[in-house]
C-alpha cells in the first residue's frame, strides 16, 4: 500500500477531489494523509519531515498532491523524498503564458470568492432541501430547482443534499408510496411543478438489501414488495413522461451530473 499525502494551504478539498479522481484509475489501495492549512514555509518544512519519515519507514517514495501557491512553501515540498504532483503549477504557469497575465497567487482565492452571494445561495439551498426532504413540506415548491421522486431508499435524500451543497440548487424530494400506485398518478401537490421533476429508480434486489438494513424481515424490505414498488414507480414515470434513471450502479456525483444535464438548471459549482 502506497502512502499519499494531500498538502494544501487551504482546506485541501480541491487537492483531495483531484487525487481521488486520479487514484481511482489504479486498482490498488492507498493510505491517504491529509495536510490542510500548510500556509507558511515553516509548516511546509514540517510537512516535508512527515513525508520523508514515510519514505524511510516504507522504503518507497510517497505520492504527494499539492495545491500550494506560496513559492517558498513549494520549494520546500519539492525537496521531499516523494513523487510531487503540483496541481496549481501544472495549470497556472501555462495559463499565465497563454493569457499574458500573472495569477494572483492568493491563498484560498476560490473560497474567498464563494463568501458572497453564491455562498448565501448555497446555505439557502441546503435549508430548502432539508425542509423539503422526503415530502415533509409542500410549501414554496415553486422555488425548487428540481424535485426528485422515487421509492423509499432509492437515493433521493443524498442526491438532494449533494445538489444543494455542491451546486446551490434547491432540491426537494418526494417518496412514491403504495397510495400513489393505487391511484396510478403522481401526488396532486406535484402536478403544478411537473417540469421540475426527475425520477430515481433502483434494482429491486439492491433495494431489498438496503431496506433490510433499516427494517430487517419486514414487508417493507421484502423482495416481492420492492419489486412491486419499483415496477409501479417506473410505470408511473413513463406514463407521466418523467425523465428518470436507475441509481443502482451510479455514484451520487454521476446521478447529480445527469440531473443537471436533463433538467437544464444553471448554477455555479462551489
Swiss-Prot record:
GO terms for molecular function: ADP binding; ATP binding; phosphotransferase activity, phosphate group as acceptor; protein serine/threonine kinase activity. Its EC number is 2.7.11.33, 2.7.4.28. It catalyses: [pyruvate, water dikinase] + ADP = [pyruvate, water dikinase]-phosphate + AMP + H(+); [pyruvate, water dikinase]-phosphate + phosphate + H(+) = [pyruvate, water dikinase] + diphosphate. Keywords: Kinase, Nucleotide-binding, Serine/threonine-protein kinase, Transferase. InterPro entries: Kinase-pyrophosphorylase, PSRP. ADP binds at residues 150-157. Belongs to the pyruvate, phosphate/water dikinase regulatory protein family. PSRP subfamily. Bifunctional serine/threonine kinase and phosphorylase involved in the regulation of the phosphoenolpyruvate synthase (PEPS) by catalyzing its phosphorylation/dephosphorylation. PANTHER family: PYRUVATE, PHOSPHATE DIKINASE REGULATORY PROTEIN 1, CHLOROPLASTIC (PTHR31756:SF3). This is Putative phosphoenolpyruvate synthase regulatory protein. It comes from Cupriavidus metallidurans (strain ATCC 43123 / DSM 2839 / NBRC 102507 / CH34).
Amino acid at each position: 500500500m502506497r502512502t499519499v499525502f494531500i498538502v494544501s494551504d487551504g482546506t485541501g478539498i480541491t487537492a483531495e477531489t483531484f487525487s481521488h479522481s486520479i487514484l481511482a484509475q489504479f486498482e490498488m489501495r492507498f493510505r491517504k494523509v491529509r495536510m490542510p492549512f500548510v500556509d507558511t514555509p515553516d509548516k511546509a518544512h514540517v510537512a516535508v519531515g512527515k513525508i520523508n519519515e514515510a519514505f524511510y519507514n516504507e522504503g518507497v517514495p510517497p505520492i504527494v498532491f499539492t495545491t500550494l501557491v506560496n513559492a517558498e512553501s513549494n520549494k520546500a515540498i519539492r525537496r521531499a523524498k516523494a513523487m510531487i504532483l503540483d496541481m496549481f503549477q501544472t495549470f497556472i504557469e501555462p495559463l499565465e503564458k497563454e493569457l499574458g497575465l500573472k495569477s494572483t497567487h492568493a491563498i484560498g482565492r476560490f473560497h474567498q470568492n464563494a463568501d458572497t452571494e453564491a455562498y448565501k445561495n448555497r446555505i439557502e439551498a441546503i435549508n430548502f432541501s432539508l425542509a423539503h426532504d422526503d415530502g415533509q413540506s409542500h410549501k414554496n415548491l415553486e422555488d425548487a430547482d428540481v424535485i426528485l421522486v422515487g421509492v423509499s431508499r432509492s437515493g433521493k435524500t443524498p442526491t438532494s443534499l449533494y445538489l444543494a451543497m455542491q451546486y446551490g440548487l434547491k432540491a426537494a424530494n418526494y417518496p412514491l408510496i403504495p397510495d400513489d400506485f393505487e391511484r396510478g398518478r403522481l401526488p396532486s401537490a406535484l402536478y403544478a411543478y411537473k417540469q421540475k421533476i426527475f425520477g430515481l429508480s433502483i434494482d429491486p434486489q439492491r433495494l431489498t438489501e438496503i431496506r433490510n438494513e433499516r427494517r430487517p424481515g419486514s414487508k417493507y424490505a421484502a423482495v416481492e414488495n420492492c419489486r412491486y414498488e419499483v415496477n409501479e414507480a417506473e410505470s408511473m414515470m413513463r406514463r407521466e413522461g418523467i425523465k428518470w434513471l436507475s441509481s443502482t450502479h451510479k455514484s451520487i456525483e454521476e446521478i447529480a451530473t445527469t440531473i443537471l444535464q436533463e433538467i437544464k438548471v444553471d448554477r455555479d459549482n462551489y
